[in-house]
């Protein structure tokens, strides 16, 4: 199980800028992943994983973060188009972040769209739970997929 944590510094700012510039020059495009969720989503696409587990400080995505009973436990659709429409609808309820420095639920949902279109199931859940309980469905979480 790959564990992605891009925020740990491995190069200084100037090296990072140079790396991105070099990639854009060579390939015409470069994705700059400066968020763990974005990085994990890109890697999920590259390795064609079946399940992407995004760990966070909450049990998943809420319609109202102030109301624990508003946890969205499942997002699905009859096809990938309807699934993405349902994710878009859920994003419309996302405002703010759970802590300073994070990009919040809206960004998590934005980043997982590409893996979802490739058939990956996404689970967004709390790091307080074991990976096994999140994957098995024993722990509360938001599960997104067809």
What is the meaning of each model-derived region?
Residues 1-146:
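C-terminal catalytic "cap/lid" subdomain
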């Amino acid at each position: 199980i790959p564990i992605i944590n891009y925020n740990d510094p491995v190069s200084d700012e100037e090296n990072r800028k140079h790396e991105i510039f070099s990639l854009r020059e060579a390939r015409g495009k470069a994705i700059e992943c400066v968020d763990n969720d974005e990085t994990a989503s890109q890697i999920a696409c590259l390795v064609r994983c079946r399940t992407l587990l995004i760990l966070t400080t909450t049990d998943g995505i809420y319609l109202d973060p102030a109301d624990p009973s508003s946890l969205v436990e499942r997002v699905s659709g009859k096809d990938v188009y309807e699934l993405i429409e349902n994710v878009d609808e859920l994003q419309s309820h996302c405002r703010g972040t759970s802590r300073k420095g994070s990009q919040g639920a809206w960004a998590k949902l934005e980043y997982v769209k590409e893996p979802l279109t490739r058939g990956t199931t996404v689970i967004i859940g709390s790091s307080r739970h074991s990976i096994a309980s999140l994957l098995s469905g024993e722990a509360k979480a938001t599960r997104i997929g067809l």
